Amino acid sequence: MNYNKKSIEDIDVKGKKVLVRCDFNVPLNEGKITDENRLVGALPTIKYLMGKGAKIILCSHMGKPKGEPKKELSLLPVAKRLSEMLNKEVIFADDDNVVGENAKRAVEDMKDGDVVLLQNTRYRKEETKNEEVFSKELASLADVFVNDAFGTAHRAHCSTVGVTNYLKEAACGYLIQKELKFLGNAVEKPERPFVAILGGAKVSDKINVINNLLDKVDTLIIGGGMGYTFLKAQGYTIGNSLVEEDKVEYSKEMIDKAKEKGVNLLLPIDNVVADKFDKDASPVVTEDQNIGEGYMGLDIGPKTAKIYSDAIKSAKTVVWNGPMGVFEFKSFANGTIEVAKAMADSDAVTIIGGGDSAAAVNILGFGDKMTHISTGGGASLEFLEGKELPGIAALNDK
């Protein structure tokens, strides 16, 4: 995939109507936004376009309204909050069909530097099917397209891909530009040693990532629930731990592939286990890889955490996706905490691949110590798999 895409700074936007796909899929509680990170992330692109005298038409999805208007998934709270953040009224075009009379009138009345926000793009069933009729309607409002929603870049929808069939000038905003810079460099030309850490519950979620990264990394660290399938593949007993029986054979193949490629594959050598999946369960540390009958692994053990931390400290590039244990239970959070600490203390380029790892790092207060925290869980995973992301492929090459 070509990561060298035109950015907003490469196109002339003065006086032009610019359709900007943002990711405003934020959590709401009784109409109040409970996490503003995605709004904050969109501000640099919006402010740049305002400063250049563009007419800015923002669009985004929120939640899964499944192709029909749902009041609780309206973007009205986003328009209100953005107005406060930008010190300028963001005009909300409240059309159930997204591109209706309100939107058309609002866009017609725009002056340079004005900002309009369209209604939730997923109010239209065509959006997720990338059907031409809605792509055309969206594109008809604008002269230029800017995509700044990395979180949906792995989806070919009307507002991420379809519009580029009608708007020939298509560039990325600052958020996507940053993602491409850090994730692209990590995958294509990392500073070595390059260490990748994969956690989370399932091998099946990360099959292609493991396979692709074994061609690129110097060290691959595996923790979390998926570690037990690997331990079983090595012939250890895993008690009642989470296991994907149908992935044991695949895990053996990956262990062999690592040897073949000269990749240092690090797997747990001890575990923190309990007799039930419960936040109040008593933690027990195993002496080695084996987990006894009646117990389940819920975190990597202290010896493993030390080995993983040392590997991270000697790296020049680190990518992390997925926690090392049941991070939400205090007794089983230590593995994740130790990995996060090692990354925070490191001078390497440190990249967090969205999702649970990003949440863990932010909860621990290490967010500002990381080089880059990806804004897209699913998109960053597909990026690490080496897949082409449709929402990025559709943008103009530099």
From Swiss-Prot:
Q: What reaction gets catalysed by this protein?
A: (2R)-3-phosphoglycerate + ATP = (2R)-3-phospho-glyceroyl phosphate + ADP
Please tell me where this protein is predominantly located: cytoplasm
The answer to whether keyword Hydrolase applies is no
Q: Does the keyword Oxidoreductase apply?
A: no
Do you know which InterPro entries this protein is assigned to? Phosphoglycerate_kinase, Phosphoglycerate_kinase_CS, Phosphoglycerate_kinase_N, Phosphoglycerate_kinase_sf
Q: What is the E.C. number? A: 2.7.2.3
Q: Which residues bind substrate?
A: 23-25, 38, 61-64, 122, 155
Q: Where in the cell is it found?
A: Cytoplasm
Q: Which SUPFAM superfamilies match?
A: Phosphoglycerate kinase
Binding residue positions for ATP: 206, 297, 328, 354-357
* GO-annotated biological processes: gluconeogenesis; glycolytic process
What metabolic or biological pathway is this protein involved in?
Carbohydrate degradation; glycolysis; pyruvate from D-glyceraldehyde 3-phosphate: step 2/5
Q: Which UniProt keywords apply?
A: ATP-binding, Cytoplasm, Glycolysis, Kinase, Nucleotide-binding, Transferase
> Which cellular components does GO assign to this protein?
cytosol
GO MF terms, alphabetically ordered: ADP binding; ATP binding; phosphoglycerate kinase activity
Q: Which family does it belong to?
A: Belongs to the phosphoglycerate kinase family.
What quaternary structure, including any partners, is listed in this protein's UniProt entry? Monomer.
Name used for this protein in its record? Phosphoglycerate kinase
